[in-house]
Design a protein with these regions (language model features):
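N-terminal acidic leader/helix
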Residues: 1-23
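Ankyrin repeat (ANK) tandem alpha-helical domains that serve as protein-protein interaction scaffolds
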Residues: 27-31, 36, 40-74
């Protein structure tokens, strides 16, 4: 599962910062790098002039995503 699908499945529609990020990702569906790795998504966010809080939130979400993917493999 890629990061985009994980975020949408887990957080889309929730009234939380993570839900807001998932909503923004879905809203930008045509441009968001759905199959991007961490660096590609960070480049995209910087290119969209995302605020520092958004970047920090993405990094926390990415860590959780990596842990969830690793746990699925166990």
């Amino acid at each position: 599962m890629n990061f985009y699908d994980w975020m949408i499945g887990k957080y889309y529609g929730k009234d939380t910062p993570r839900g807001d990020l998932a909503g923004d990702m879905k809203h930008e569906e045509a441009g968001f790098p759905k199959d991007g790795d961490r660096e590609r998504i960070l480049d995209y966010l910087h290119g969209m002039f995302a605020c520092d809080e958004c970047i920090a939130l993405f990094k926390r979400c990415w860590r959780d995503y990596e842990k969830a993917v690793a746990d699925e493999g166990k």
